[in-house]
Amino acid sequence: MQSLGYEKYFAQGGDWGAAVTTALGTQDSNCEAIHLNMAVVSPDMETMDNLTEFEQQALAGFQFYQEWDSGYSKQQSTRPQTLGYGLTDSPIGQAAWILEKFYQWTDCDGHPENAVSRDELLTNVMFYWLTETAASSARLYWESFGEFNGGEVKTPTGVSIYPKEIFKASERWLKKRYTDLRYYNVLDSGGHFAALEKPDLYVNEIRSFFRSI
């Protein structure tokens, strides 16, 4: 960012972008604050005897993900190249691999096009198909999972929680890692692809936090 002329800046991210944003917040003193829409933290074991309703739902979501929704992650983190050959060879296979996540992770009431337009869905698929990056994008999991750093983050942080997000965390769970959590909001609609699903709401969340810094 300094090479672009920004001596101070804010950063925002979700999914892998949340990991990158967190890294910026911990490794670059010029990053003054971070906002996340998928902050990954472990449940605080000290809260297990007095869980809130939200925390109970979050734990149920973790369990569902591990049992039914994490097959893609296990494949990409162990045998990404094997998967890549099939996806690079089949546009239908590539589309199915991507679009299933829009079905599962958007606030779509059973149909992805209720949350994201068909053109946007196909554009997302084409990013992988035209660039032939099914394998290399999958390898990100294989290359990164062993390097995950769950250490303390002292940078001022804001977190927005969407109901159809993959991982959700309560405010007190987040504060165990993000020790300067200044903004926490649980929204009524939206999912994992918040910027595509609810762009106005997404922008408002980012502005609401950074405006306070």
Each model region followed by its residue ranges:
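The feature captures the conserved acid-bearing segment of alpha/beta-hydrolase catalytic domains
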Residues: 49-80, 150-152
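Conserved hydrolase catalytic core segment
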Residues: 3-57
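Generic detector of intrinsically disordered, low-complexity, polar/charged segments
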Residues: 10-14, 58, 68, 83, ...
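C-terminal subdomain of alpha/beta-hydrolase-fold enzymes, centered on the catalytic histidine
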Residues: 76-213
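Membrane-interacting alpha-helical segments
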Residues: 41-65, 161, 167-174
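A sequence-composition feature that detects small, non-aromatic residues
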Residues: 11, 18-19, 23, 33, ...
